[in-house]
């Protein structure tokens, strides 16, 4: 067989292979991409005390990347600047930033990185993950209510409760009795900016 026919045959085979692979590559790249609207989102906390202490974090970032359109492939990443704590009281904020609590000089970030997503029912989703504060990492759970399914925009609002003493926060604030249980409230609003809709199982 002439050499040019062998070369043409090889080129044709490579072309066919490329044509067959390109659609799958394109599909693999099609995942939902969401952007969080910081202006309308909040991360808050409260702890029962002789007077309940409530506060927010003014500086934080959150992402929700997907590896497919299936909700359970999402990964929730939250990074909070601990020094941005805001209770409305300079004395309390200073105490919380100090070494007895957040210890922001040594460990400036509070983070949550999800490792598993479970749909509980049509409106409730649990994110199991690693929670880190003061350089101590432990497994915790964020339980969210999901709204706006199928609209391209929505909200996930959830809570996580942890024992502050598990993370080395054993002391209190002068003249204030503080409970051990701390509740974190995460309210994220965002929209899908590209990719297919998220697929929910329920």
Predicted regions and their residues:
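Exposed, low-complexity/repetitive linear segments and helix-based recognition motifs
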Residues: 6, 26-27
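Polar helix-capping/helix-linker motif
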Residues: 7-8, 21, 70, 98
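Low-complexity, acidic/polar, glycine-enriched regions of mature
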Residues: 27-202
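Bacterial N-terminal signal peptides
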Residues: 11-24
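Bacterial N-terminal signal peptides that target proteins for export
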Residues: 2-14
């Amino acid at each position: 067989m002439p050499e040019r026919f062998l070369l043409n045959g090889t080129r044709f085979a490579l072309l066919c292979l490329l044509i067959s692979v390109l659609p799958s590559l394109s599909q693999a790249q099609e995942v939902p991409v969401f952007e969080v609207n910081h202006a309308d989102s909040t991360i808050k906390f409260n702890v029962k005390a002789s007077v309940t202490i409530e506060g927010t974090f003014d500086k934080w970032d959150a992402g929700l990347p997907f590896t497919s359109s299936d909700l359970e492939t999402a990964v929730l990443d939250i990074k909070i600047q601990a020094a941005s704590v805001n209770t409305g009281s300079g004395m309390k904020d200073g105490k919380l930033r100090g070494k007895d609590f957040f210890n922001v000089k040594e460990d400036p970030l509070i983070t949550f990185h999800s490792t598993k997503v479970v749909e509980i029912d049509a409106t409730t989703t649990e994110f199991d993950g690693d929670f880190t504060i003061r350089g101590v990492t432990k497994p915790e759970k964020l339980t969210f209510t999901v709204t706006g399914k199928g609209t391209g925009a929505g909200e996930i609002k959830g809570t996580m409760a942890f024992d502050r003493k598990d993370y080395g926060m054993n002391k209190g604030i002068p003249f204030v009795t503080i409970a051990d249980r701390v509740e974190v409230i995460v309210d994220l609003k965002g929209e899908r900016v590209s990719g297919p809709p998220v697929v929910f199982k329920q």
